[in-house]
Amino acid sequence: MEDKKRRLEELLQTPCYSIDFLPQPIPPAALSQFRTIQHHLLNSEKRQEIKNRIVNILLKLLCFFPACVLWDGWKEQSSPQLIEQAVDTVMENHSGSLYLLFWQEESLLVFEWDALSLSLYHPSQQLLNLAQTIARSEGFFLYQF
């Protein structure tokens, strides 16, 4: 477990890509308006639609890449129900994070409560290509921070 925690912390320091419902980062001049829109989306009926898209992205990626999941402790195998329940809990409680460590790819995917996106750290080229295709299939975009 210590190895996974250490690896997670190392990966958080590597190049990061965003799987986002927006096509590019928000410019500083538009942050206030974005926060208003983000608050609305996270606190309205739209939240369910966004949650479903995020869960779909995660589950599709898990079809191709095995991952250890950090949610209430490390899980070597994740179930679709665990992923959906974790994303739902994070969004409902407006707190928490879900981590997927793709150990064969040496990559990390993070979902945090205050984001309408996923953060993908140190993706292999294969993971990056597939993540982009999957993101598009769910109406999301992939770009590097």
Feature-to-residue mapping (PLM):
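Structured alpha/beta or helical-core interaction and ligand-binding surfaces enriched in interleaved
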Residues: M1-S117, H122-F145
